[in-house]
Regions:
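Secondary-structure transition into beta-strands, especially the periplasmic turns and strand N-termini
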Residues: 192-194, 285-287, 352-354
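C-terminal hydrophobic structural anchor segments
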Residues: 85-89, 347-378
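Post-signal-peptide, soluble extracytosolic/periplasmic N-terminal scaffold domains
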Residues: 1-7, 13-14, 156-159
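Gram-negative/organellar outer-membrane beta-barrel architecture
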Residues: 33, 49-242, 311-325, 332-340, ...
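Conserved "repeat-terminator" motif of extracellular CCP/Sushi domains
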Residues: 12-20, 85-92
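N-terminal periplasmic "start-of-domain" segments of outer-membrane beta-barrel proteins
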Residues: 34-48
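C-terminal outer-membrane beta-barrel translocator/porin domains of Gram-negative envelope proteins
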Residues: 65, 95-98, 226-350
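Extracytoplasmic/secreted envelope proteins and their assembly/folding machinery
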Residues: 36, 40, 56-60, 274
């Protein structure tokens, strides 16, 4: 967690990591009594057992890694000092947040968020988020927590989109539409670094205009609603979101789309499988190699326009949830129903906050997954500079690909949202 350096691990007297002592009881101070069971479970601490200092420090790191506590300390008490007491200080999750982002595509965007954490019998959390910019949205989230790592959540989001779609570097269509999104989900993070989420969604796409700039009007689009079911699994050990220095991220998403809970347009539903993998391999103290793989496959007949594969930009999900990043293509382009992307990012850190990145990536896409290796190949790359400021990342890059003829330029100031 990026917050781990702000937490304190405290013990009452100096000891060696290999020292072993007997623990008769494990006690907690400063937490809700209902959380003791799962906290004992994930920490691995057991009563009436032998414990090394190293194992104790690992258990405390796990507690800190939940990101629920601002301070964690321990002490040994009792006549023989056999009672282990862990004292924690819970974080307050009620907050008001403001974000500001400047970039060369959207120009400026403002994000406002208010979160209220209600620590009643059943922990619940309510938040309201709004974004102002070329892409505007309002979102309301409500979650009930069975324990801090398991929750049932209900969300509603309204988005106004003004999207430009490109093909081989040329804009082919501009579309404006309103997107209504409702989600009911269950999240389970009881496994260390692993999150599982299951649920159902309703989405309605209310298209306002669909303006082609080319003669080929390939996509026939009308307002349409979808009922979908999804499962997501995410393994995350990256030490921070931006400029990670170690760890891996592996994410798998599978969604089934219908228009009546069961079928789509009178035939079998269509579905989408998405996989993303990123690893950070330190070569020296300042030089790292970041290999990544992204892929998405649409399965079934007549996949709907709002869920087609789109590629482009320097980060995933920039404009649409299914968007895959590709260095050398700045704008969003529609690809075939099966897409795979391999990327290598060689990143050099200069000093503490400056980074130079050299990225090469290769994509292949084809409508039929079993013919993917016969599909169209796309090559691209970029060179970029970034500064990790206290206000968020500031980065710029220049890119090229065989999908367009022009040098691509992108500038970003601040966290992306």
């Amino acid at each position: 967690s990026s917050d781990m350096h702000r937490n304190r691990l405290v013990h009452s007297y100096p000891v060696a990591p290999t020292d072993t002592f007997h623990i008769r009881r494990v006690l907690f101070e400063g937490i809700d009594p209902r959380d003791e069971k799962w906290l004992t479970q994930i920490s691995g601490l057991k009563e009436n057992s032998l414990l090394t200092v190293k194992k104790l420090q690992e258990a405390m790191s796990i507690v800190i890694g939940t990101n629920l506590y601002s301070n964690v300390s321990y002490k040994l008490v009792g006549e023989r000092q056999e009672d282990l007491v862990l004292t924690v200080q819970e974080k307050s999750n009620s907050a008001i947040n403001v974000g500001l982002n400047f970039n060369s595509e959207d120009i400026v965007a403002l994000l406002l968020n208010a979160t209220f954490d209600n620590r009643a019998r059943y922990h619940s959390k309510f938040s309201v988020t709004g974004r102002i910019g070329k892409r505007m949205y309002g979102r309301v989230d409500y979650a009930i927590e069975r324990n801090p790592l398991r929750n049932i959540n209900l969300s509603y989001m309204f988005t106004y989109h003004d999207l430009d779609v490109y093909n081989r570097g040329d804009k082919i269509v501009n579309t404006t539409y309103r997107h209504h999104f409702v989600e009911l989900g269950y999240s389970d993070m009881n496994w260390l670094n692993f999150k599982l989420k299951l649920g159902a969604r309703y989405e309605y796409f209310d298209y306002n205009s669909f303006l082609y700039t080319a003669e080929n009007q390939k996509y026939q689009v009308k307002p349409e609603g979808f009922i979908s079911y999804f499962a997501q699994a995410h393994l995350e050990t990256l030490d921070r979101r931006y400029f990670p220095s170690k760890g891996v991220s592996l994410q798998a998403d599978y969604s089934i789309y219908t228009d009546n809970f069961v079928t789509y347009k009178g035939h079998t539903f269509f579905s989408a499988l998405k996989l993303s993998f990123l690893s950070v391999l330190p070569l020296t103290s300042h030089l790292s190699l970041l290999p990544s793989i992204d892929g998405r496959v649409l399965i079934g007949k007549d996949p709907a326009y709002p869920f087609l594969n789109v590629v482009g930009g320097d980060m995933p999900e920039r404009y649409l949830p299914q968007q895959l990043p590709f260095a050398g293509i700045n704008r969003m382009e529609i690809f075939d129903n099966s897409v795979a992307i391999v990327r290598l990012n060689l990143r050099q850190r200069i000093g503490q906050r400056h980074y130079i990145s050299l990225i090469a990536n290769y994509a292949i896409h084809e409508d039929n997954f079993f013919d993917l290796l016969k599909g169209e190949s796309v090559w691209g790359g970029s060179i970029g500079y970034a500064y990790n400021s206290m206000f968020g990342p500031m980065n710029t890059n220049f890119g090229l690909s065989n999908r367009n003829n022009n040098l691509q330029f992108y500038l970003n100031l601040g966290y992306s949202f």
